[in-house]
């Protein structure tokens, strides 16, 4: 049964290695609980996935996209603008308040803090 199914699928996916990748991914989806698009007929998940590809109830392009997405580890996220990013990170809160202390006043305050005068 499976050999006939593979030969039927080669028309839809000419590369046998890619066919194996797509069928195994679909078999994992079925095992995870995705609904079947054809009758099971006492076949196991890999055979069902090959039959789905052969009957074109699962398109190779859609399976390929889902396979690629399942292997992606980094999700692309739109980054906010640089100005908004600084506000979101609280950079404005980290800056000292505006002060009118001169250099001379600062030196005197430091000397007093150290106990010198």
UniProtKB/Swiss-Prot annotation:
NCBIfam families to which the protein is assigned, alphabetical: rpoZ (TIGR00690)
SUPFAM superfamilies: RPB6/omega subunit-like
Subunit structure: The RNAP catalytic core consists of 2 alpha, 1 beta, 1 beta' and 1 omega subunit. When a sigma factor is associated with the core the holoenzyme is formed, which can initiate transcription.
Keywords recorded for this protein, A-Z: DNA-directed RNA polymerase, Nucleotidyltransferase, Transcription, Transferase
Origin organism lineage: Bacteria, Pseudomonadati, Pseudomonadota, Alphaproteobacteria, Rhodobacterales
Pfam families xref list: RNA_pol_Rpb6 (PF01192)
This protein's encoding gene: rpoZ
GO biological process, one term: DNA-templated transcription
Family statement: Belongs to the RNA polymerase subunit omega family.
Biological function: Promotes RNA polymerase assembly. Latches the N- and C-terminal regions of the beta' subunit thereby facilitating its interaction with the beta and alpha subunits.
Enzyme nomenclature, EC number: 2.7.7.6
InterPro entries assigned to the protein according to its UniProt record, in alphabetical order: DNA-dir_RNA_pol_omega (IPR003716), Pol_omega/Rpo6/RPB6 (IPR006110), RPB6/omega-like_sf (IPR036161)
Reactions catalysed, as given in the entry: RNA(n) + a ribonucleoside 5'-triphosphate = RNA(n+1) + diphosphate
GO cellular component, one term: DNA-directed RNA polymerase complex
Taxonomic superkingdom: Bacteria
Protein name as it appears in the record: DNA-directed RNA polymerase subunit omega
GO molecular-function term, one example from the UniProt record: DNA binding
């Amino acid at each position: 049964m499976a050999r006939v199914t593979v030969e039927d699928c080669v028309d839809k996916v000419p590369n046998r290695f890619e066919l194996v990748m797509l069928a195994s991914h679909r078999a994992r989806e079925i095992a995870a609980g995705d609904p079947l698009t054809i009758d099971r007929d006492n076949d196991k998940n890999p055979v069902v996935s090959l039959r789905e590809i052969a009957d074109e109830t699962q398109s190779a392009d859609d399976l390929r996209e889902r396979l690629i997405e399942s292997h992606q580890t980094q999700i692309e996220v739109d980054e906010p603008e640089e100005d908004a990013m600084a506000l979101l990170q609280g950079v404005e809160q980290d800056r000292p308040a505006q002060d009118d202390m001169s250099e001379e006043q600062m030196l005197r305050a430091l000397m007093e803090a150290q106990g010198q005068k």
